[in-house]
């Protein structure tokens, strides 16, 4: 029987939460699925919400870079706090360069899960499998 574990956004909100995930994963689980990083505290923003805001800012030609910077800070902080080698800065720079009015909302918002999954895969020592595959 195939065993899959799913962790929501608050379970992967920061490096401390990643450590908890690693500690509780049953070795019999073959697949781990994660949401985008969630809130670290009540007044914090979910990465998914920030991505939706970026999409709205792009649609109405409003500056979105400060929102994107919050996402960059979150992911780079997790990477650095866990001592990971995944060059997330490259994927973030690529995404930043792709941002435009014609970008699919689904694609943009899915980047939160994608980047979180890349980080957790390295941290757990699991192979990364892109959901699109």
For each feature predicted by the language model, list its residue ranges.
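Nucleotide/pyrophosphate-binding catalytic subdomain
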Residues: 1-133
């Amino acid at each position: 029987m195939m065993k899959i574990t799913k962790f929501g956004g608050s379970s992967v909100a920061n490096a401390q939460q990643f450590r908890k995930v690693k500690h509780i994963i049953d070795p019999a689980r073959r697949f781990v699925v994660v949401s985008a990083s969630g809130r670290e505290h009540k007044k914090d923003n979910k990465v998914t919400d920030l991505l939706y805001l970026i999409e709205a800012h792009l649609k109405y030609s409003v500056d979105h870079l400060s929102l994107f910077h919050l996402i960059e800070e979150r992911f780079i902080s997790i990477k650095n706090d866990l001592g990971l080698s995944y060059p997330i800065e490259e994927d973030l720079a690529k995404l930043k360069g792709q941002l435009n009015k014609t970008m699919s909302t689904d694609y943009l918002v899915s980047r939160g899960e994608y980047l979180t999954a890349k980080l957790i895969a390295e941290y757990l020592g699991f192979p990364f499998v892109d959901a699109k595959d």
